[in-house]
């Protein structure tokens, strides 16, 4: 056991985590040169296309250290994006240490800080690594000072390496062996294994990634899942070298995968503990704190026949992604679907794209909303996550919206633009600290504003230099209203949005204009209105197409033309009272982008 090292790699987006993992695998000979490819751990097509890590991946390597011993390194490559921070905290729970990778050109950024604090809270040993020192813009001395100044860990003798060229990677490995503690645990105690991650394989059933905290696990053991009490036999067990390799068992302190032939998707939830069926452990390990979704949106299959396969797809995805929440919902405009909860807009995009790709579904999304707290006049408090659940205005005593605490790190020269942006988003500044050339701003901004497009706007006003980390702080009383969109006098429930009263007029006008461009012209006029309660605040009309009925009259009396025109008018009136307007798919998507430009 004293030759095992478990660690994660944490860093901000694009600071070179995945490339460093590649080098570690290559140096330790985990894969032959032929099988090696860039970002070998980003196994999803989506990850490779966007160049980001979404799922944490684990690898077991054997490293021949300079002191002559062979060490077993179990490491987990983690995502850097704020939407996937729960992946990071789960990975850290399985480790004793973390490599904090910092780009020697960019310096410390918000996610670096957030992930590093998470690691310190869990009492992990944090080892700083300065990456990308082969770049002409690299300033390792300045960045080392920055790490000490902002993060507060000793970084003067931090390892300098370049993951791309492979320079200094052996030093990183030596640092890991020297500084990260060996796992603690009792090999002879009853088994306690923490499930870090699970995914569904159509041949094997549920595959779980586990970290053995106490005891050991062998093939053909009978094990019990502690939360459900079900007993299973271990069919296959092994490690990733990044390839799945079968072994006979896992010892204390090791990380590996287990297949027990569990077919029920909820059979082995993430954060659960496995133990032996006979004389097992008394109590379960402390799991992970449940993450609450921040953004909710309705997802509906375009053809209603896909509803069942959509439910299956969500089930399988939620096994792999513990933070996805969903419940059935129905809409008069869109039929049956699910109300899903996500951690942020990127998470929502990724999930939607994974559903469409991996499960071949065509989906419509409704406008995303955050969770609001409403105090009713009878004194009860309710939480709503969709405009449809909002009670009538007369029964609402006060409405509270979620406020997010945002930590923004940016170079001084962009401070003006960023502050303007925060004020526009109804933000309140609570703190500001200078660290060398960097400024750390703390703002309290309504979650609804942060979640929609704050991240994109922040990146564009600061030319990509500002970085953001945010978390839910509290609910605060606010003047929110529900904006309904009416087409020909009928409310379309899927187009309703909850917005702040100050922005309601503007949002309403914009949505109405947008809809006018997107709804195809019919044989009759279509009125598109935006309303708050019974008060109409914006309106626009899609003009009717008309046939030239008087074309066949040549000369002749004006009353003949009048008769034909009146007859046409009557017909249009009748069509208008009976005609239904189909709202095209693009119109629902347009709602998402209102207020961006």
From Swiss-Prot:
Which InterPro entries has this protein been placed in? EF-4, EFG_III/V, EFG_V-like, EFTu-like_2, G_TR_CS, LepA_C_sf, LepA_CTD, LepA_IV
Source domain of life is: Bacteria
GO BP, sorted A to Z = positive regulation of translation
Query: What Gene Ontology cellular-component terms does the record carry?
Result: plasma membrane
How this chain sits in the membrane, per its record, is:
Peripheral membrane protein
What is a single molecular function from GO for this protein? guanosine tetraphosphate binding
* The protein's name: Elongation factor 4
- Which Gene3D superfamilies does the record associate with it? 3.30.70.240, Elongation factor 4, C-terminal domain, Elongation Factor G (Translational Gtpase), domain 3, P-loop containing nucleotide triphosphate hydrolases, Translation factors
Which keywords fit this entry according to its UniProt record?
Cell inner membrane, Cell membrane, GTP-binding, Hydrolase, Membrane, Nucleotide-binding, Protein biosynthesis
Q: Which residues bind GTP?
A: 14-19, 131-134
Function comment: Required for accurate and efficient protein synthesis under certain stress conditions. May act as a fidelity factor of the translation reaction, by catalyzing a one-codon backward translocation of tRNAs on improperly translocated ribosomes. Back-translocation proceeds from a post-translocation (POST) complex to a pre-translocation (PRE) complex, thus giving elongation factor G a second chance to translocate the tRNAs correctly. Binds to ribosomes in a GTP-dependent manner.
Pfam families registered for this protein in UniProt: EFG_C, GTP_EFTU, GTP_EFTU_D2, LepA_C
Per the UniProt entry, what species is this protein from, by scientific name? Aeromonas hydrophila subsp. hydrophila (strain ATCC 7966 / DSM 30187 / BCRC 13018 / CCUG 14551 / JCM 1027 / KCTC 2358 / NCIMB 9240 / NCTC 8049)
